[in-house]
UniProtKB/Swiss-Prot annotation:
Gene Ontology terms: cellular component: chromatin; nucleus
InterPro entries: p53-like_TF_DNA-bd_sf, T-box_DNA-bd, T-box_sf, TBX2/3_TAD, TBX2_3_RD, TF_Brachyury, TF_T-box, TF_T-box_CS
Species whose genome carries this gene: Danio rerio (Zebrafish)
Protein name: T-box transcription factor TBX2b
Quaternary structure, from the entry: Binds DNA as a monomer.
Origin superkingdom: Eukaryota
């Protein structure tokens, strides 16, 4: 029985193995067909043309494979003969026609190129054929392979392909079996058979079954029909091979002929993004975003130059806020901004400069400065996810002629905008008698509600005589110098020890969580005793001295945020439990001072200046301003506070001297800061 089987097998392989024995090695079938059935894919090309039981020449790796499969293959030989005998009586005459022949002809005239990549690239046009004349009941396996068209290597020179030399050694052959195989003739003839999932690669060690080709070589795809009901019978079945000359191509790693590139762009539905005019979403998005991109670039220019004209900030504002404008807006701006606001506003602080415009839209309901008012809970609820972001409120940009970085300016704007809206709503609902300037407000970095033990003089002296320079430390020129929040000086000794992620959350969530008493009130009864050490940390960070708070546990962005939030640990469990809140107008939950805690470390030496009382002090801190109401429910920035100076503890001059002495003690406590001591000595006479 072996002789007929051997003969039949040899005849089945005759068209493929006689003159080129490596055309269809067994490994090609196994790698392409079902590698899970055959873990060892290194069979020699003629291994299965010998009698199966003869394993004398088999290697050690194949020794375990052949005994296990020998009986299976012998049975397969017998089954193939028995199954083919009755089927031979049924005559079929398959007719194969190439789909998209006109397109193939266009490519063929120019010289078809197919890109090969290491990860595998599909062919375009895809190899697609229509079959007729199959036996409807019989099962067929359809395959495809790609063979070298000649023994030449090519190069593209002077707009045409020419022979550049002899071909490189051929890559291992691989058959691509159609994933629907085996299927009945009726199924194959029902629709065109597409091999669109076939991928070409130049990775010699490819493990995915892709067809491996050499770049700059010409190849010819071939289509095979095998009448068999099992893929395991492929090596012992007769192949019908069909070749379409117009499908030959040259494998390239990048397109050489621009005409081929354009032809592929024009006809490949997946290349719409490269077209100049297209109907795809990508093209529409590109067209619609052009005006928005121009506005964005203009706005970036405005931010960098620090322009303070209304015209420079009003027009881009409408573009940025159009995505959230209640009125009808042009579709390009709505399309560009609306879908990205929520995403970009959650990005990290490092992308603030580039995403200034997008984040602005998510927190401003209308492009006009007089935007609809929002309640405090809604405002601070919205501040939680973007506490470290910025807002681009146009009013706060009008006077941005500082040399602060854009990032500092934008972060200040966020708090300014939210507090201004809260201001306006409070004025309308609860305290209509209080009049404040809407347009001049000072930004606040972190809002805390710690009880303060300092009066107006303390706060004035804490303006740090040299820091009232509006060029360096007052980016918005609203008349307020660099100030510290009074709550940052009233921390209990255990405030730092309890500092963990809770204070990071507090710093991120703003003051909304603090009002609800979500943080522990560990510093309720605290005294100013820890003031020198704690203030030194905050003050040094603001003066540009790179001294990390909390011993450098967290990086730069966290130290100043958590420093202000740590002061919030001295806050009572609820904003109504501490009696000091009712006594001091600065400490009620609604009228707490909005003193800006400047986070950015600028290496700027503090100039010697003695003007502390008049220059740059906000009206709310000036002891001469008596036109205010105490205990007002106004939650506005410091310039809007009109708290009476008569109700503050102590006289301004005496408290100023005390705080100045404390400031000098702070300077002495810090080691290695001789330069700071020299600059702090003139502060003894701030009057």
């Amino acid at each position: 029985m072996r002789d007929p089987v051997f003969t039949g097998t040899a005849m089945a392989y005759h068209p493929f193995h006689a003159h080129r024995p490596t055309d269809f090695p067994m490994s090609a079938f196994l790698a392409a067909a079902q590698p899970s059935f055959f873990p060892a894919l290194t069979l020699p090309p003629g291994a299965l043309t010998k009698p199966i039981p003869d394993h004398t020449l088999a290697g050690a790796a194949e020794a375990g494979l052949h005994p296990a499969l020998s009986h299976h293959h012998q049975a397969a030989h017998l089954r193939s003969l028995k199954s083919l005998e009755p089927e031979e009586e049924v005559e079929d005459d398959p007719k194969v026609t190439l789909e998209a022949k006109d397109l193939w002809d266009q490519f063929h005239k120019l010289g078809t190129e197919m890109v090969i990549t290491k990860s595998g690239r599909r062919m375009f046009p895809p190899f697609k054929v229509r079959i007729n004349g199959l036996d409807k009941k019989a099962k067929y396996i359809l395959l495809m392979d790609i063979v070298a068209a000649d023994d030449c290597r090519y190069k593209f020179h002077n707009s045409r392909w020419m022979v550049a030399g002899k071909a490189d050694p051929e890559m291992p052959k691989r058959m691509y079996i159609h994933p629907d195989s085996p299927a009945t003739g009726e199924q194959w003839m029902a629709k065109p058979v597409a091999f669109h999932k076939l991928k070409l690669t130049n990775n010699i060690s490819d493990k995915h079954g892709f067809t491996i080709l050499n770049s700059m070589h010409k190849y010819q795809p071939r289509f095979h029909i095998v009448r068999a009901n099992d893929i395991l019978k492929l090596p012992y079945s007769t192949f019908r091979t069909y070749v379409f000359p117009e499908t030959d191509f040259i494998a390239v790693t990048a397109y050489q002929n621009d005409k081929i590139t354009q032809l592929k762009i024009d006809n490949n539905p997946f290349a719409k993004g490269f077209r100049d005019t297209g109907n795809g979403r990508r093209e529409k998005r590109k067209q619609l975003t052009l005006p928005s991109l121009r506005m964005y670039e203009d706005q970036c220019k405005v931010d960098r130059d620090g322009a303070d004209s209304d015209a420079s900030s009003s027009e881009p504002t409408t573009g940025r806020d159009a995505g959230h404008s209640p009125g009808p807006v042009s579709s390009p701006l709505r399309f560009n901004r609306g879908s990205r606001d929520d995403k970009t506003c959650t990005d990290s602080e490092h992308e603030m400069d580039h995403q200034n415009d997008r984040c602005g839209g998510s927190s401003s309901p209308a492009p006009e400065p007089s935007s609809p008012f929002r309640s405090r809970s809604e405002d601070w609820g919205r501040e939680k996810p973007i506490a470290e972001k910025k807002d681009d409120y146009p009013d706060s940009r009008k006077t941005s002629d500082s040399i602060f970085s854009i990032r500092n300016l934008e972060k200040d704007k966020l708090e300014s905008r939210s507090r201004k809206d809260t201001d306006s709503s409070k004025k309308d609902t609860e305290n209509s008698g209080i009049s404040g300037s809407k347009d001049s407000f000072s930004p606040l970095m972190v809002q805390t509600e710690s009880p303060s033990h300092f009066g107006a003089g303390h706060l004035q002296s804490l303006a740090l005589s040299g820091l009232h320079s509006q060029q360096f430390f007052n980016p918005l020129n609203t008349g307020q110098p660099l100030l510290f929040h009074p709550g940052q000086f009233a921390m209990a000794p255990g405030a730092f020890s309890a500092m963990g992620m809770g204070h990071l959350l507090a710093s991120v969530s703003g003051a909304g969580g603090l009002e609800n008493g979500s943080l522990s009130a560990q510093g309720t009864g605290s005294t100013p005793s820890p003031f020198p050490f704690h203030l030194s940390q905050h003050m040094l960070a603001s003066q540009g001295i790179p001294m990390p708070t909390f011993g450098g546990l967290f990086p730069y962005p966290y130290t100043y945020m958590a420093a202000a939030a740590a002061a919030a640990s001295a806050l009572p469990a609820s904003s109504s439990t501490a009696s000091s809140l009712s006594r001091n107008p600065f400490l009620s939950s609604s009228t707490r001072p909005r003193l800006r805690f400047n986070p950015y470390q600028l290496p700027v030496s503090i100039p010697q200046s003695t003007n502390l009382l008049t220059t740059g002090l906000p009206s709310g801190l000036n002891p001469s301003s008596e036109s205010s109401k105490c205990g007002s429910r106004e939650a506005s920035p410091v310039p809007d506070h009109k708290s009476g100076a008569s109700q503050r503890n102590g006289s301004p001059k005496t408290t100023m001297k005390e705080s100045i002495n404390e400031l000098q003690n702070i300077q002495r406590l810090v080691s290695g800061l001789e330069s700071q001591r020299e600059t702090s000595s003139p502060r003894d006479s701030p009057k």
